Amino acid sequence: MLKMGVVLFTVLVLFPLATLHLDAEQPVERYAENKQDINPDQRSGFLTFALRQGCCPPGVCQMAACNPPPCCP
């Protein structure tokens, strides 16, 4: 009975923990490899697009009682 408990613990607890650790590292490596292929002009394009979006929803900063934060256009 003790041997079966040790085998079950190993299979159900330790083995999944080891595989999850490997899976967690792979997306970061893939993401870094994908970004290395982009030239600097394209990288800055992503950033400027995000900055142009603004942080306020449309119509919020036009209200009379609104004190717009500095990010509102």
Curated annotation (Swiss-Prot):
Pfam families registered for this protein in UniProt: Conotoxin (PF02950)
Keyword Secreted found: yes
One of the record's GO cellular component terms: extracellular region
Residues of the signal peptide: 1-24
One of the record's GO molecular function terms: ion channel inhibitor activity
Residue numbers of 4-hydroxyproline PTMs: 57-58, 68
Tissue distribution of the protein: Expressed by the venom duct.
Residues making up the propeptide: 25-52
Transmembrane segments: none
Disulfide bridge partners, by residue number: 55-66, 56-71, 61-72
Main location: secreted
InterPro entries named in the record: Conotoxin
Keyword tRNA processing among UniProt keywords: no
Swiss-Prot/TrEMBL keywords: Disulfide bond, Hydroxylation, Ion channel impairing toxin, Secreted, Signal, Toxin
Domain notes: The cysteine framework is III (CC-C-C-CC). Classified in the M-4 branch, since 4 residues stand between the fourth and the fifth cysteine residues.
Recorded family membership: Belongs to the conotoxin M superfamily.
Descriptive protein name: Conotoxin Vr3a
